[in-house]
């Protein structure tokens, strides 16, 4: 475990998703045996909200706790937003289990057919804290 420079994490993330990440961002790299196993990238910070992107084999409770702590305690946001593709079925199953609520559908967000819609999911601070309480039992 440990932390890495955000640029190193960004480069790893871009290599995994196969496209550049252009916005101003912050990042958390999750390590195992001194190698990045997963990454969380945050961008479009408004003071109240930040957008969230994750790449990894799965999101562990420990990783998720770090993400919640960073977003809601360090940044003092009131919401965390992610916009997965409609076709990312595993993600769409996992997000509600993590306390996220679907807020909107962005037609053709990732392309020109219905499978390329973006689904806006939001985790509010109160729901994140509730999730932490239920998982601490």
Where do the PLM segments sit?
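Short hydrophobic/aromatic beta-strand or adjacent loop that forms the aromatic wall/cage
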Residues: 25, 116-120
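Conserved acetyl-CoA-binding loop-helix of GNAT-fold acetyltransferases
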Residues: 59-73, 89-97
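Conserved beta-hairpin
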Residues: 24-38
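Short amphipathic alpha-helix that is part of the acyltransferase structural core
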Residues: 1-18
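Conserved beta-strand-loop-alpha-helix junction that forms the acyl-donor binding cleft
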Residues: 82-92, 109
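Conserved acetyl-CoA binding element of GNAT-fold acetyltransferases
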Residues: 45-57
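Conserved catalytic-core motifs of GNAT/GCN5-like acyltransferases
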Residues: 101-116
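Conserved GNAT acetyl-CoA-binding A-motif
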Residues: 73-84
């Amino acid at each position: 475990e440990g932390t890495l420079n955000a640029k190193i994490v960004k480069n790893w993330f871009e290599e995994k998703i196969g496209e550049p990440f252009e916005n101003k961002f912050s990042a958390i790299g999750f390590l195992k045996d001194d190698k990045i196993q997963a990454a969380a990238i945050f961008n479009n910070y408004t003071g109240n909200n930040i957008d969230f992107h994750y790449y990894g084999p799965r999101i562990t409770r420990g990783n998720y706790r770090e993400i919640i702590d960073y977003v809601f305690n360090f940044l003092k946001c009131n919401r965390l937003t992610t916009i997965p593709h409609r076709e990312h079925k595993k993600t769409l199953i996992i997000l509600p289990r993590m306390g996220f609520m679907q807020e909107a559908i962005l037609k053709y967000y990732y392309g020109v057919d219905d499978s390329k819609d973006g689904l806006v999911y939001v985790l509010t601070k109160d729901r994140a804290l509730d999730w932490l309480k239920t998982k601490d039992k």
